Curated annotation (Swiss-Prot):
Monomer. Its EC number is 3.1.1.29. Keywords: Cytoplasm, Hydrolase, RNA-binding, tRNA-binding. The gene is pth. Belongs to the PTH family. One of its GO terms (cellular component) is cytoplasm. TRNA binds at Y18, F65, N67, N113. Hydrolyzes ribosome-free peptidyl-tRNAs (with 1 or more amino acids incorporated), which drop off the ribosome during protein synthesis, or as a result of ribosome stalling. Catalyzes the release of premature peptidyl moieties from peptidyl-tRNA molecules trapped in stalled 50S ribosomal subunits, and thus maintains levels of free tRNAs and 50S ribosomes. It comes from the Bacteria. This is Peptidyl-tRNA hydrolase. It catalyses: an N-acyl-L-alpha-aminoacyl-tRNA + H2O = an N-acyl-L-amino acid + a tRNA + H(+). The record marks D92 as: Stabilizes the basic form of H active site to accept a proton. GO terms for biological process: protein quality control for misfolded or incompletely synthesized proteins; rescue of stalled ribosome.
Length: 187
């Protein structure tokens, strides 16, 4: 992969009932980024989401449910001819503790239905993922109710700190300095 990020998408489910849930931490990331850059996210039906242009890159918060996130990502990417390798997807990560945030280049979906759908719609898994840790409930049968509920106050504070850490590295992501971002986040 080469070049910098031209599309940043933050995954989550639409609606107030999901806004504060663990599954929406990718959307938290994107909303905070838009606020920090003084960008208003405007609803764009053709892109199935809320969109803003921020200098040389696009912000996208899908209005689809998590499992259909690929519709939004692919619509915007195809329209603006953005390659998968120029896309960053911010999403919740069960396999990391709350407070961890890591950058991953390509790979599978790891059981994440939003990523699975994006891979399907793009026809590629060669995009970057900003994996925001939310902890694991301990057993796979508890995953759905867990991700669809708000985090504890301590976890929320840790998640917000991780988001801030990731936001500080947006300039490097846009410039394509992925190795620096990985060094910063993974150490």
């Amino acid at each position: 992969m080469s070049g910098g990020v031209k599309l940043i998408a933050g995954l989550g489910n639409p609606g107030d009932q999901y806004a504060r849930t663990r599954h929406n931490v990718g959307a938290w990331f994107l909303e905070t980024l838009a606020q920090q850059r003084n960008q208003s996210l405007a609803k764009e039906n053709k892109f199935h989401g809320f969109v803003a242009k921020c200098n040389d890159y696009w912000l996208l918060k899908p209005t689809t449910f998590m499992n259909e996130s690929g519709q939004a990502v692919a619509a915007l990417a195809h329209f603006y001819k953005i390659k998968p390798s120029e896309i960053l997807i911010a999403h919740d990560e069960l396999d990391f503790p709350a407070g961890d945030i890591r950058l991953k280049e390509g790979g599978g979906h790891g059981g994440h239905n939003g990523l699975r759908n994006i891979i399907q719609h793009l026809g590629s898994s060669d995009f970057y993922r900003l994996r925001i840790g939310i902890n694991h409930p301990g057993h796979k049968d508890r995953v759905t109710p867990y991700v669809l509920s708000p985090p504890s106050e301590n976890d929320r504070i840790a998640i917000l700190a991780a988001i801030e850490k990731g936001l500080r590295l947006i300039p490097e992501l846009v410039q394509g300095d992925f190795q620096k971002v990985m060094r910063e986040l993974h150490s």
